[in-house]
From Swiss-Prot:
InterPro entries: UPF0178. Belongs to the UPF0178 family. This is UPF0178 protein BB_0029.
Length: 143
């Protein structure tokens, strides 16, 4: 079981953050939502909102192998995986050594070519992403 869950809130779906808040009420872990801007979030004993200038550095300093980080940032995910931290995105994709190098390479090419990828989702797909997140989150949390 994981001791801390960090959320890179600047790129995370708010519905996922709300799910994690409810989940953490029944578990002994700590949810740390990190953002570079303040937003409305119910703070409880197990939930903390940290507003910092550099989200990645803040998480990097506190995360360990008993932590899970939720982020969409592939470059940050690779760095965390190299340190033994569990990482997934808010769509339910679990990052690991089998997929991160390809995703990192692809992101680096897109960045160098200044290619921005926009994703458009319909409501049904959003529901499937949410369900995939929950399923994969449970598998990581309780492993």
């Amino acid at each position: 079981m994981l001791s801390k869950i960090f959320v890179d809130a600047d790129s995370c779906n708010f519905k996922i953050i709300k799910f994690l808040q409810k989940f953490i009420l029944h578990n002994k872990s700590k949810l740390i939502v990190v953002s570079n801007k303040f937003f409305s979030l119910e703070i409880t004993e197990n939930v903390a909102l940290e507003v910092v200038d550099n989200v990645d550095s803040f998480i990097l300093n506190l995360a360990d192998r008993y932590s899970l980080v939720i982020t969409r940032d592939i470059f940050f995910a690779k760095l965390l995986l190299d340190l033994g931290v569990k990482v997934m995105n808010d769509e339910g994709r679990i990052f690991d050594i089998n997929n991160i190098n390809y995703l990192y390479f692809r992101s680096k090419i897109n960045f160098n070519l200044k290619i921005k990828i926009k994703k458009y989702y319909d409501e049904d797909f959003n529901k499937s992403r949410y369900e995939k997140f929950i399923t994969n989150f449970y598998s990581l949390f309780f492993s």
